[in-house]
Amino acid sequence: MKVKKGGGGAGTGAEPASGAPGPSVEPKPEPQAESESGSESEPEAGPGPRPGPLQRKQRIGPEDVLGLQRITGDYLCSPEENIYKIDFIRFKIRDMDSGTVLFEIKKPPASERLPINRRDLDPNAGRFVRYQFTPAFLRLRQVGATVEFTVGDKPVNNFRMIERHYFRNQLLKSFDFHFGFCIPSSKNTCEHIYDFPPLSEELINEMIRHPYETQSDSFYFVDDRLVMHNKADYSYSGTP
C-alpha cells in the first residue's frame, strides 16, 4: 500500500550510501536491529522526564498532540499501553526521484535476538532513535518511507500516526497518516510518501550547525487513543 502523507514546513533527508543521501542511526538498546546500509553506534540517553498537563491526562487523543508547538519533555504513554502488541520490524527510506534506497534497517527474527535480562531493561528502550544524516538529505524533495510491522491477537481499528518535527522547538512540519484497520496476528507493509518543500539556505545552515536540535515526536493511535509514542533527534552534519 502506498500513501501520501500531508504535512508542511521543512523536510528531513539522509545522506548517500554509494553516492546518494543515506543516514546512520543510533537506536537505543532494545531494537538490536540489523542495518543494511548506514551504521549504528551507542546513543546518548533519551529525553528525561519533564511532566506536563498531557502526562496527567488519562486518555490522550489526536487533537491533544496536534496542538503541541514544541517537542514533548517526556513520553506521553507507557510501553504497557501498547496492548495491541504493534511491533515495527523493518524500515526503508528511498529517494522518490531516483528510486535509490538510502537506508534500510530490520529487526532480526526473535530466534536470533540476544537474551535480555528484563530486570535490567530500560522501560523506554527502543522508543528513542538518534539519526546521523548528511547535508544532502535536507535538499531532497520527496522521500518514500516503507514500514513493516506486526500486530498481536487483537484487531487494530483506525490505526493512525501523527509525526511532528521541530528545530529548536519551532514546528517545522507535521504529518498525519491513517493506516486503517489491521487484522489480528498480521504482518503489514505500507509506504508513506513525504513531500518536502525547499528549505532556505539560512535554515539549512542552522540545522547543520546545530546537530540533534532537530527533534521529532511520533504518536500512534488506535481508535483515537494514544498507544505508542516514539522520539528521535537528528544531525545533518554528516559526522557523529
UniProtKB/Swiss-Prot annotation:
InterPro entries xref list: Ig_E-set, PDE6D_unc-119_myristoyl-bd, PDED_dom, PDED_dom_sf
Signal peptide: none
Post-translational modification: Phosphorylation suppresses its interaction with KLHL18 and down-regulates its KLHL18-mediated degradation. Phosphorylated more under light conditions than dark conditions. Dephosphorylated by calcineurin.
Modified residues (Phosphoserine): 37, 39, 41
GO biological process, one term: lipoprotein transport
UniProt keyword annotations, A-Z: Cytoplasm, Cytoskeleton, Endocytosis, Lipid-binding, Phosphoprotein, Protein transport, Sensory transduction, Transport, Vision
Region Disordered, annotated ranges: 1-61
Gene Ontology molecular functions: lipid binding
UniProt: tetradecanoate binding residues: 131
SUPFAM superfamilies assigned to the protein according to its UniProt record, in alphabetical order: E set domains
Similarity comment text for this entry: Belongs to the PDE6D/unc-119 family.
Domain notes: Adopts an immunoglobulin-like beta-sandwich fold forming a hydrophobic cavity that captures N-terminally myristoylated target peptides. Phe residues within the hydrophobic beta sandwich are required for myristate binding.
Subunit (UniProt): Interacts with CABP4; in the absence of calcium. May interact with GTP-bound ARL1. Interacts with ARL2 and ARL3 (GTP-bound forms); this promotes the release of myristoylated cargo proteins. Found in a complex with ARL3, RP2 and UNC119; RP2 induces hydrolysis of GTP ARL3 in the complex, leading to the release of UNC119. Interacts with NPHP3 (when myristoylated). Interacts with CYS1 (when myristoylated). Interacts with MACIR; interaction only takes place when UNC119 is not liganded with myristoylated proteins. Interacts with LCK; this interaction plays a crucial role in activation of LCK.
Biological function: Involved in synaptic functions in photoreceptor cells, the signal transduction in immune cells as a Src family kinase activator, endosome recycling, the uptake of bacteria and endocytosis, protein trafficking in sensory neurons and as lipid-binding chaperone with specificity for a diverse subset of myristoylated proteins. Specifically binds the myristoyl moiety of a subset of N-terminally myristoylated proteins and is required for their localization. Binds myristoylated GNAT1 and is required for G-protein localization and trafficking in sensory neurons.
Name of the protein in question: Protein unc-119 homolog A
Organism: Canis lupus familiaris (Dog)
